[in-house]
Amino acid sequence: MKENLLIIYFLFLFVISSFAQENTILYWGELLQKNTPADNTYYTHKSPIVKWKGVNGASDYECKTDCSGLINQLIKQAYNIDDAAFNKWMKKKKRAYAKDYYNQIKKGNGFQGFTNIKDAKPGDVIAIKFPKLMDDTGHIMLITEAAQEIEPIEPTVLGTKQWKIKIIDESGHGHGTTDTRYLGNGKYKTGLGTGYFRIYTDSTGEIVGYAWSTETGSKYREADVRKVIIGRLNKKFE
């Protein structure tokens, strides 16, 4: 009898745990990235097409959007909310862009914000806000693994530490030769993929800049110019 009760108890915990995992953008992001065929993803600013096989009648996984379009759809899927509820929360008439995520994280609107890389956890997002007049408003990525401090790689910046952090994003360019979108000979496929982003910090872990990858040819960008923040969703949707 005791054994049966224990089995039922552990099964209950497993079901609860599985349900909790499905209610996260990390779960849906990894599911999408691992299963989307290469022919079913590319980078575009047009109306997003993001599908999970078996969800809402979708016959396959598909991801044709841009960086913010991906995160928008992940949140809607994980929290089962429609466009109206999402746009009301993000204070947008149509859709949210990377700069909007940076602004809302900064304000604490449904997010807890961090600027120390040591606070970053899987399931958080990295939001970057570009200066005005640039073609894009910024970039946003989903963190899948905790940051790891690495030996400094060129370009080096005096007085900084370097970290690599694994992310999923929708981009026109992959993050180095270990990125899943890398085709060889310096070429990349656009669309959904995963790779390592490089963060520069001061001695305490506060973010001072970044580079697109851990490759030596990746340019250093100052966080004073291209503003960087880490966001953790804590919004309660009704």
Model-derived segments and their meaning:
Residues 4-16:
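Sec-dependent N-terminal signal peptides
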Residues 9, 59-60, 111-112:
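Generic anion/oxyanion-binding catalytic loop in active/binding sites
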